[in-house]
Amino acid sequence: MAGNGVFVDIIEGDVFKYYSEGEWKKSASGKSVAIINPTTRKTQYKVQACTQEEVNKVMEVAKTAQKSWAKTPLWKRAELLHKAAAILKEHKAPIAECLVKEIAKPAKDAVTEVVRSGDLVSYTAEEGVRILGEGKFLVSDSFPGNERTKYCLTSKIPLGVILAIPPFNYPVNLAVSKIAPALIAGNSLVLKPPTQGAVACLHMVHCFHLAGFPKGLISCVTGKGSEIGDFLTMHPGVHCISFTGGDTGVAISKKAGMIPLQMELGGKDACIVLEDADLDLAAGSIVKGGFSYSGQRCTAVKVVLVMESVADALVEKVNAKVAKLTVGPPEDDCDITPVVSESSANFIEGLVMDAKQKNATFCQQYKREGNLIWPLLLDNVRPDMRIAWEEPFGPVLPVIRINSVEEGIHHCNASNFGLQGCVFTKDINKAILISDAMETGTVQINSAPARGPDHFPFQGIKDSGIGSQGITNSINMMTKVKTTVINLPTPSYTMG
């Protein structure tokens, strides 16, 4: 159970502590933040409401710890990361339990997230040793007008203190995707977990604590965004921000100042289905891509753009698969579980009601109980409907019928988002042309959008983000280049 066994130190009474200076602490504020169980809609956990003074202290110790950590050999950093990964996977059950109760993630998917996170940490350790152990060597006479009198050596050095802000939907996986690259690169790390998912993150951080990382190197502060959110993102002690979430990231980017930013801010991932597509493959991918974890994924299929000539057949196949989806509590491993909050459910319902008023075709009856929304496919959606453009982050999927590939590409590119897209066709040449034309960070051919595997580059354009993720790219963006030039009195090739 959460807060028991090896995790007993992270809770006192009914409030989970925050992590600073290698210790679990109670906030001087004396206040806590409630975490509501999406299924019961009752308080499940409480976390500390940290103060700005406590944030200042965290930043101070993170700066000091980073200086020593940067001098720690790469192999030693990797060794500790491998140890943390093993501990994380060993204690997957209580962490998964938190995910079930905090964010209504189906039980099996919750376990998968923790195991995947451990694998990510281990892979990052290995990749970091490879890419950070290499540098570049340049000679001056490769540039016109120069003799070989200068040798240039370049290496990658840490940025300093990294601020990591993961989202609610994958709080553990998207936290470690920031933590592990930061640490292997020689940085210190301050984690601000989402409110929903905070307790799972605290358990994960304790696994790093048990692995024996130096005090102050990793910190985790919890609290209200209104009190410490801007204070964290604008803090002069932060040298890089890695954020995954919604349009809050736009505000962060405007306030952050001259530091590197890595941001993934959502998407309206389009699925284009052509006449020659394998409709069974497309239908299966659409249902999995659109309804997994109740559609609460940045890379979920958010709109289907299907050629009119095959639309009826595709919709029929999708509806048949939707009918087989199970609906209920996450403890029962249902396909569709409650969305994360009442406000999210209300937003989704607003999109549905707008589509209803504008005469979209409801392939299923709209049904909602509390935060639980039954899966819904909306056919004959038009561009004047909100659901055609806005990201529902729920189990509602619009279908827009198109008469040409160009029409589908135009709709995709007219979106303010540009995270991922996909195309289903048996013509690889046409698929590549469409991929080049789609204004998205990634295009999947004959598969639904997806973030993984975790070592693949992952990025969005337009309002979907800044920079690129994926293990290698994250390590690189959390470092800077250091150049050392050796100056010779005479060209090196003159001897002999």
Curated annotation (Swiss-Prot):
A Pfam family: Aldedh
Binding positions for substrate per the UniProt entry: 116, 169-170, 297-299, 451
Recorded GO CC terms: cytoplasm
InterPro entries (alphabetical): Ald_DH/histidinol_DH (IPR016161), Ald_DH_C (IPR016163), Ald_DH_CS_CYS (IPR016160), Ald_DH_CS_GLU (IPR029510), Ald_DH_N (IPR016162), Aldehyde_DH_dom (IPR015590), ALDH-related_metabolic_enz (IPR051020)
Catalytic residues of the enzyme: 264, 298
Compartments in which it is found: Cytoplasm
Positions of NAD(+) binding: 245-249
Assigned keywords, A-Z: Cytoplasm, NADP, Oxidoreductase
Superkingdom field: Eukaryota
UniProt record similarity statement: Belongs to the aldehyde dehydrogenase family.
PANTHER family: ALDEHYDE DEHYDROGENASE
Protein name: NADP-dependent glyceraldehyde-3-phosphate dehydrogenase
Species whose genome carries this gene: Nicotiana plumbaginifolia (Leadwort-leaved tobacco)
